Regions:
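Intrinsically disordered, low-complexity, charged terminal extensions of DNA damage-control enzymes
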Residues: 3-165
Length: 165
C-alpha cells in the first residue's frame, strides 16, 4: 500500500506529522505540502463516430467478431465501422464489397457510449439480408445472444432496436 495515499492527501490537509519521510520531504521544506500532490488533468475524451448496420434475416441478426486485441477484444457486435459516419449508400457499398446485399428499412436511432478515453457516437441503418454470413460474421438468434455471443453494452441501444419477425 502506498503510504502517501494516506498521508499526502490531494484534497485535504496533509498529515506530515505521521509521515516517516517528513524530514526528507522537499514539498514540506518548501512550504508547499498543502498544494501536493499535483493532480494531472484528465485528457479530453475523443469523439469517435461509429456507423452500425443492424442486419436481420431468417436466422437472426448478423454479428461480427471484434479483433482479438484492443478495445472490446473478441466480443461480438452488429456490423460496424469505427471512425467514420457513413451515409446509407456508403454503408451499402461497404457491405456489397463483402458480399452482402441488404434491403434497407430505416435509420437506426443514434446512441452514445462513453469509455474512459473516448466517446462512441453510434448511428447507422437497419435492413434485412439472406444467405450465408460473410467471413468473420455469424447469424445469431435471440436465444444465442443470451448465451453464446457476448455483445458489449456499447451496442445495447442498437441491439434493442432489433425487432425479430
Amino acid at each position: 500500500m502506498l503510504f502517501r495515499s494516506l498521508v499526502c492527501l490531494p484534497n485535504g490537509a496533509p498529515k506530515c506529522e505521521v509521515c516517516p519521510l517528513a524530514a526528507q520531504c522537499k514539498g514540506r521544506a518548501a512550504g508547499r505540502a498543502e498544494q501536493l500532490p499535483v493532480k494531472t488533468a484528465k485528457p479530453e475524451k475523443t469523439l469517435v463516430p461509429v456507423t452500425a448496420a443492424l442486419i436481420t434475416g431468417p436466422q437472426g441478426v448478423l454479428l461480427q467478431r471484434r479483433p482479438s486485441k484492443g478495445l472490446l477484444a473478441g466480443l461480438w457486435q452488429p456490423l460496424a465501422f469505427e471512425g467514420t459516419a457513413m451515409t446509407q449508400p456508403e454503408l451499402d457499398a461497404a457491405l456489397r464489397a463483402i458480399g452482402l446485399c441488404v434491403q434497407w428499412q430505416a435509420p437506426l436511432q443514434s446512441t452514445r457510449h462513453v469509455f474512459t478515453h473516448r466517446i462512441w457516437q453510434i448511428s447507422g441503418f437497419c435492413g434485412t439480408a439472406a444467405g450465408p454470413a460473410p467471413e468473420g460474421c455469424v447469424w445469431a438468434s435471440r436465444a444465442e445472444l443470451n448465451g453464446e455471443y457476448a455483445v458489449p453494452s456499447a451496442f445495447a441501444g442498437i441491439m434493442r432496436q432489433w425487432r425479430p419477425e
